[in-house]
């Protein structure tokens, strides 16, 4: 009797729009379409890393219920419009940006002054409309995070004390806007009781639908891997024989850490600890890296963010690493 479970052999990605795509995988054993589809959907909506405006200071404004002379919108509507700006930070956890403009007409996200490592995905998005003689001057703090974080959770934190004029925003960090899935029938030879999983994903443009699925799947793998490492390794008795000599690693793990484009300080700290490949890096824990001379919390956060953008985290386990023939320099 056949006891091996089928694994998907066909993966198809169909672009439905600029930020929408349909991802189809088949075949699955009966029931696995719903099992995996629901798990992926929940992770996509709740656990993806993204960036959002979290605080704003507007010249001449003391609180969100104010109005500004020469500006058509009140402050509440300005904040709502600001939440619609899609930011993408490269190799940093947070940044404070400036927006200054005067003269009649719309003020868009393209008017925000950004450094080279900050990207605005929707520069045409309107933030305010100025009347004759109007002007706007604001400072916008952008941070990375996961999911939805109400402003009340950070408003009176010890690290960022409440100050007059500082308006704390509710932040929706997730780059995934909508996810739905359906399970259809699939057939392999004479078997007609199989599943086909169809995921339809819409993002805000900061990530592609394919990258979002890839990152969410890796999060699930990392979480489920804990159950395969129960004390006593009792699950090993049920595993199929594995040829360790033919262990295949994700190609990204075999790339040098230089390709992560870390700051010079972070890169030198890693090399000093003989961490040359991404596969070496992800097996280190946060505590281990913090013990590295000259590598502080800021550098650690940079490393974590760069890894997260590739669907990786610190503290992962790799069997049979390093692979035979890998140059350890």
Curated annotation (Swiss-Prot):
Keyword match Transcription: yes
GO biological process: DNA-templated transcription
One MF term in the entry's GO annotations: protein dimerization activity
Entry annotated with the keyword Nucleotide-binding: no
Catalysis performed (reactions): RNA(n) + a ribonucleoside 5'-triphosphate = RNA(n+1) + diphosphate
Sorted UniProt keywords: DNA-directed RNA polymerase, Nucleotidyltransferase, Transcription, Transferase
EC number assigned by the record: 2.7.7.6
Enzyme class: transferase
Highest rank taxon of the organism: Bacteria
Assembly description: Homodimer. The RNAP catalytic core consists of 2 alpha, 1 beta, 1 beta' and 1 omega subunit. When a sigma factor is associated with the core the holoenzyme is formed, which can initiate transcription.
NCBIfam families cross-referenced by the UniProt entry: PRK05182.1-2, PRK05182.2-5, rpoA
Function of the protein: DNA-dependent RNA polymerase catalyzes the transcription of DNA into RNA using the four ribonucleoside triphosphates as substrates.
Protein family according to the UniProt entry: Belongs to the RNA polymerase alpha chain family.
Protein name stated in the entry: DNA-directed RNA polymerase subunit alpha
């Amino acid at each position: 009797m056949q006891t091996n479970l089928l694994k998907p052999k066909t993966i198809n990605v169909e672009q439905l729009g600029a930020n929408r795509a349909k991802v189809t995988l088949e075949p699955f054993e009966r029931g696995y379409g719903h099992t995996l589809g629901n798990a992926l959907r929940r992770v996509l909506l709740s656990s993806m890393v993204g960036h959002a405006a979290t605080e704003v200071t507007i010249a001449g404004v003391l609180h969100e219920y104010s109005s500004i002379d020469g500006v058509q919108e009140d402050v509440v509507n300005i904040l709502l419009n600001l939440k619609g700006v899609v930011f993408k930070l490269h190799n940093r956890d947070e940044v404070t940006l400036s927006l200054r403009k005067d003269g009649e007409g719309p003020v868009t996200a393209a008017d925000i002054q950004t450094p080279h490592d900050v990207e605005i995905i929707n520069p045409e998005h309107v933030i305010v409309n100025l009347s004759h003689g109007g002007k706007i001057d604001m400072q916008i703090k952008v941070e990375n995070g996961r999911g939805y974080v109400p402003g009340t959770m950070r408003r009176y934190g010890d690290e960022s004390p409440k100050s007059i004029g500082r308006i704390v925003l509710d932040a929706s960090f997730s780059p995934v806007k909508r996810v739905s899935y359906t399970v259809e029938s699939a057939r392999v030879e004479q078997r007609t009781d199989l599943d086909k999983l169809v995921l339809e994903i819409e993002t805000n443009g900061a990530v592609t639908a394919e990258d979002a699925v890839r990152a969410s799947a890796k999060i699930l793998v990392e979480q489920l891997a804990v159950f395969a490492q129960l004390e006593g390794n009792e699950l090993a008795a049920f595993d199929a024989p594995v040829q360790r000599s033919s262990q295949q690693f994700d190609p990204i793990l075999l790339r040098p850490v230089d390709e992560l484009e870390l700051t010079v300080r972070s890169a030198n700290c890693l090399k000093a600890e003989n961490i040359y490949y991404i596969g070496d890096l992800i097996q280190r824990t946060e505590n281990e890296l913090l013990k590295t001379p000259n590598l502080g919390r800021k550098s650690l956060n940079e490393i974590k963010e760069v890894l997260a953008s590739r669907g990786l985290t610190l503290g992962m386990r790799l069997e049979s690493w390093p692979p035979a023939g890998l140059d350890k320099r």
